């Protein structure tokens, strides 16, 4: 996959004709510098998106959305072509998913002095856990908790503010996202254990079955060839792994 591959493939002929693939990202897959406004995209996503564009032989265009729900709307409206998204059963009726590309650990960020040391410590009456509404990490946690209360915000920054201002006792999300925010809250800790993992796949509109088949092939090729592992290494993030192959028996 080191060289561009011009594709004479009917499954993605529309993308080749357009000369670009529009990859949608949602917060916190990208961030804006508050001073310069410069966009920073998670390296592992950017590198994998570039590899897809190279395989297609087209330009890569990154589009910004605030939430996963807005990305799904964009996919089905045709305003974007592909996205990276956790393959949750609640989303499967709206978009089509490739096999997983990445596996991302879910855990908690807790403030200085917190008595929460392990995941199990947080599931108690009276404990408030901040979450981003409709994120895969939230959907997973909502199925696991028996006693703690979820406190919702729409995007990562206001979710962090719930923790920072004492309106929540922990924040549940992807580990490397929490690591970045931890630097903004002195004494805070990201727990070492996890309550699950995000199997991050590539998503397309349900109406594009051919495109999905093509992208699923790309994903398996990228995992097997080391492209995904190299993208992870370039990003240097903790708690991020290459997802297992979709068909382990086919790997040599």
Question: Language-model features: where?
Answer:
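Short helix-initiation/N-cap motifs at beta->coil->alpha
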Residues: 46, 61-73, 117, 151-165, ...
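Alpha-to-beta junction loops
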Residues: 21-22, 58-59, 76-85, 126-128, ...
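Ligand-binding cleft/hinge of the Venus flytrap
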Residues: 32-38, 49-59, 98-99, 123-125, ...
